[in-house]
Curated annotation (Swiss-Prot):
Transmembrane segments: none annotated. It comes from Mycobacterium tuberculosis (strain ATCC 25618 / H37Rv). Gene3D superfamilies: 3.40.50.10950, HprK N-terminal domain-like (3.40.1390.20), Isocitrate/Isopropylmalate dehydrogenase-like (3.40.50.10750), P-loop containing nucleotide triphosphate hydrolases (3.40.50.300). Its main location: cytoplasm. Disulfide bonds: none annotated. Residues 365-690 are annotated as: Phosphate acetyltransferase. NCBIfam families: PRK05632.1 (NF004167), PRK09653.1 (NF007233), pta (TIGR00651). This is Phosphate acetyltransferase. GO terms for cellular component: cytoplasm; extracellular region. The gene is pta.
Length: 690
């Protein structure tokens, strides 16, 4: 790797929020090149690993272990600076040789600091051949003070012969951004101002519990990861406490203040009041049994923490608690990425680096492109399973990143209450309760008309429209939404059946099938059908191939279709291989411009060396991107085998053949899976609109 493919993040002080900047750089770099690494030249000597490095390693694509991504400790640097820098350079080059680009995150002033620490970082950057991205803290400073800090830092870096590529003034009050921006215009390097975001330094309920030396005595375990956005020491009467409550607040009160406990618990459960993060009972007092029983009867999921500390000590500890952005802090990570996207020209900054043109497509590159493509033309997607926490968390992320517009089905009060408890902002979503919607009876009448040949009456149709999946499908059918994603808590049949009954298939296609987008370390392949049709006929197999090629093209995959069998070319005989041969000819007749080969074995389809001996002149063999399996048994087992043995990321199943997109989730789907599936559905909907 050329040294100019690295960028060095340096700061003159602690608490500048460099991890936010580093996340944004890594996120964009992993979408540009295959192997992105991160390096920490100086770390503390500690039994615990550097949490910032662990956070950033989770967002790299070079696959290097922690031990290879660190240089020296502060102790080594203080003992012999020249030797330490030489060791840093050696360690850096050893890891950088395996990367296309590296983000180097300088020291954090977390050990015995020195007035020359920035100079040391500048000297290291010069020795690594990396331009510097200077990060300063704007919080609690006037615009002139921020400019003065930047001026001193630029001079110091220039003394070390370091090249400063850009300046970021981080953690700036929103109202001060225009003035700080103006104050930095006089400097040569481009400057960016990023606002302060309280969420990034907010402790979680679990971190607050540790800070007050407490223990969680009741409440939903999942809510211990919610961020605490404020602290109230409730020493006043209950009515004044209620006036001061805000979303995400932790309320501290002695355990014997039954009036306050009841008021706060009731407020949390009541519609129109803020959703709290937790209650902290201090003083070592236990709730009176009658009060405890009453609170329990409210069926709150709100975490309740008990501590033996007094009110002052509890409030002081809680107010000074600071949260970390760790590898599991997904909401904070999403917020950091949004801040960088909105306030820093990351693409322009990285354009200063010499980054190799990629010849492969990694999973990170592909998923980034998916989200960008979905974001380019916002579609409205309906999520029928509004009572599932995974759906709500996914919805929050999708809305925060501006990937789609959303309609969520469910009891609006319950959906929004649970979202608030999870720390999820659904302000940008429309929430509809099917049975209470003004569209309910209209949809029932329409459905009864569509299905009258099947004996469906209006009364029966009204019952069916109470089902969120059917109601969501009708929203798509009537253009109130562009697509639907379901299945987190329902079977595939429950998701697909309404679509077949209502939306129906594309003209010329009689089969609804699926593909998985298989993100291998160096490329993305489409596998079909691995989820829907057990034993396809010749005509169905041809439908699957044609639909899969169209779907692959929608996601930037040039379709070259391999019709898979146990033999290649004319070498095999029998009913199974004859079916594949006939389906291949049918595809050629229906889509003469589509490159297709079959029957062909898997290795001959994807390995050029095998193809050279078996099908030398084929435009598909050895280069296939769309692989069509002869039956569901083969397809399903193959995709799972490749997923497990090759470490591939399987995105799907992506349903195809419908007039409008409806996609199914695995009941074990993770939040990332749901986000990707919604993005895919949005891209399919964009194709329908074209």
């Amino acid at each position: 790797m050329a040294d100019s493919s690295a960028i060095y993040l340096a700061a003159p002080e602690s608490q500048t929020g460099k991890s936010t900047i580093a996340l944004g750089l890594l996120h964009r770099l992993t979408a540009m090149v295959a192997k992105v690494g991160v390096f920490r030249p100086i770390t503390r000597l500690s039994a615990e690993r550097d949490y910032i490095l662990e956070l950033l390693l989770a967002h790299t694509s070079a696959g290097l272990p922690y031990e290879r991504c660190v240089g020296v400790t502060y102790q080594q640097l203080h003992a012999d600076r020249d030797d330490a820098i030489a060791e840093i350079v050696d360690s850096y080059h050893a890891m950088a040789d395996e990367c296309d680009a590296v983000v180097v995150v300088g020291s954090d002033y977390t050990d015995v600091t020195s007035p020359t620490e920035l100079s040391v970082n500048g000297r290291i950057a010069v020795n690594l051949g990396a331009p510097v991205l200077l990060t300063v803290r704007a919080k609690d400073r006037t615009p002139d003070q921020v400019a003065s800090v930047v001026e001193v830092c630029l001079a110091e870096l220039d003394t070390q012969r370091a090249h400063t590529a850009a300046v970021v003034a981080n953690r700036c009050e929103l109202s001060a951004i225009p003035a700080v921006t103006d104050a930095l215009r006089r400097f040569t390097p481009p400057s960016y101002v990023v606002p302060e975001e309280p969420l990034l330094s907010a402790p979680t309920v679990a971190e607050l519990t540790q800070a007050v030396n407490g223990a969680v005595v009741s409440g939903d375990v999942a809510l211990r990861e919610r961020e605490v956005m404020g602290v109230l020491a409730a020493g006043m009467t209950a009515d004044h406490v209620l006036e001061r409550l805000t979303d995400g607040m932790a309320v501290i009160t002695p355990g014997d203040r039954s009036d306050v406990v009841l008021a706060v618990a009731s407020a949390h459960a009541a519609e129109g009041f803020p959703s709290l993060s937790c209650i902290v009972l201090n003083g070592g007092f236990q709730l009176h049994p009658a009060i405890a029983a009453l609170v329990s009867g409210l069926r709150l999921r709100l975490p309740v923490i008990a501590t033996a500390l007094g009110t002052y000590d509890t409030a002081s500890a809680a107010a000074s608690a600071r949260g970390l952005v760790t590898a599991t802090s997904q909401r904070k990570i999403d917020t950091a990425l949004e801040l960088m996207d909105r306030h820093v020209d990351v693409a322009g900054l990285l354009a200063q680096l010499t980054i190799p043109i990629p010849t492969v497509t990694t999973p990170q590159m592909f998923t980034y492109r998916l989200l960008q493509q979905a974001r380019s033309d916002l579609m409205r997607i309906v999520l029928p399973e509004g009572d599932d926490d995974r759906i709500l968390k996914s919805a929050g992320r999708l809305l925060q990143r501006g990937i789609v517009d959303l309609t969520i089905l469910g009891d609006e009060a319950k959906v929004r209450l649970r979202a608030a408890e999870l720390g999820v902002d659904l302000d940008g979503a429309t929430v509809i309760e099917p049975c209470a919607s003004e569209l309910h009876d209209q949809f029932a009448d329409q459905y009864a008309q569509l299905r009258k040949a099947k004996g469906i009456t209006v009364e029966h149709a009204r019952e069916i429209m109470n089902d969120a999946t059917y109601f969501g499908t009708m929203l798509v059918h009537n253009c109130h939404a562009d697509g639907m994603v379901s299945g987190a808590a329902h079977t595939t049949a429950h998701t697909v059946r309404p679509a077949l009954e209502i939306i129906k298939t594309v003209p010329g296609i009689s089969t609804v099938s699926s593909i998985f987008l298989m993100c291998l370390p160096d490329r993305v392949l489409a596998y079909g059908d691995c989820a829907i049709i057990p034993n396809p006929t010749v005509e169905q197999l041809a439908d699957i191939a044609i639909c899969s090629a169209r779907t692959a093209a929608q996601f930037g995959i040039e379709p070259r279709v391999a019709m898979l069998s146990y033999s290649t070319g004319d070498s095999g005989k029998g009913a199974d291989v004859d079916k594949v041969r006939a389906a291949t000819e049918l595809v050629r007749a229906r889509e003469p411009q589509l490159p297709v080969e079959g029957p062909i074995q898997y290795d001959a389809a994807v390995e050029p060396s095998v193809a050279a001996t078996k099908l030398r002149d084929s435009p598909v063999a050895g280069r296939a991107t769309v692989l069509i399996f002869p039956d569901l048994n083969t397809g399903n087992n193959t995709y799972k085998a490749v997923q497990r043995s090759a470490g591939a990321i399987a995105i799907g199943p992506v349903l195809q053949g419908l007039r409008k997109p409806v996609n199914d989730l695995s009941r074990g789907a993770l939040v990332d899976d749901i986000v990707n599936t919604v993005a895919i559905t949005a891209i399919q909907a964009q194709g329908v609109h074209e």
